[in-house]
Amino acid sequence: MQRREFLKNSAILGSVALFGGALNLNANSQNLKGEAMKFITLNDGNKIPILGYGVYQIPQNDTQRCVEDAISVGYRSIDTAQAYQNELGVGAAVNSAIKGGIKREEFFITTKIWVSNATESGVLRSFEASMKKLGLDYLDLLLLHQPYNDVYGAWRAMSRLKNEGRIKSIGVSNFYPDRLVDFAINNEIKPAVNQIELNPFHQRKFDREIAKKYGIAVQSWASFGEGRNDMFNNPILKKIGEKYGKTVAQTILRYLIQLDIIVIPKTTRKERMVENFSVFDFELDANDMQTIADIDEQTSLFNDFNHLDPKTVEMLNGWKLPD
């Protein structure tokens, strides 16, 4: 199916939900079509929806509207970060939904500690600031955004907050296998999640194997590679999608979901939120799974942002969040 055709159809569906009163805001873990969500059980026993909504690069003044749209579609897992500078909008949307009847426990809210706050005292201080912006009593998942600064001191503070019940789960982001293994071995509480770049052209098989060995769930950022490599027009992905009457975006998300990879696609358009959520009514067969596995180029689509490059490390350490 062409994405344009799907967007036309889903725009109609979205309008019905917005103006026709057909949406059940209390429908737990279902989208507009009533398709059931799948959950991943983390190593601490907590459960995270395998499909969530990411707000990276969404301006603060547009975040509340986008998250409200996502919630109306059926998303309950929302991924933000201190560095995104839009926690206020996320919190406003989530709290509005709670006042509207959705239970707090239906949501799974994630934020991340930025590099400049990645110290023991920095975590404690910045966590309180994030929670004030989010307007929540507890957080479902707190991640270290980057593997830099005093990550062990930061982890001690995160572990303390988890033990106090302020955070349900703690994890990391952008940790390469060597750092992840060292972190898992030398901390009493292992990361529950490692959020990394992962898409059809950069599938990180070795990273996934290491994470599985240590019981750490893998979460994908940039599942669509921000459209790089002309991903949405890839003939292999298009052909597979057409077989199931699905778009390339849906095919990618379904592929990752069947690998038990948590996905958090971002879009500001409600019809695409619907599109991205409509991935639980089909299943890729083994041949199609292997075909997509074979297009892996085993290289990042963001080589201008290489976490192993000293210049990138200098840049990320030098970037301070505004007060």
Question: Which residues does each PLM region occupy?
Answer:
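CE4/NodB-like, metal-dependent polysaccharide N-deacetylase domain
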Residues: 123-143, 160-164
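Short, acidic/polar
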Residues: 59-70, 119-133
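Active-site mouth loops of central-metabolism enzymes
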Residues: 51-60, 113-119
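Beta/alpha (TIM)-barrel catalytic core signal, keyed to glycine-rich beta->alpha loops juxtaposed to Asp/Glu
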Residues: 146-323
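Glycine-centered flexible beta-alpha turn that most often forms the glycine-rich phosphate-binding loop
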Residues: 53, 78, 139, 170
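N-terminal export signals
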Residues: 5-26
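C-terminal segment of N-terminal export signals and the immediately downstream linker at the start
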Residues: 22-49
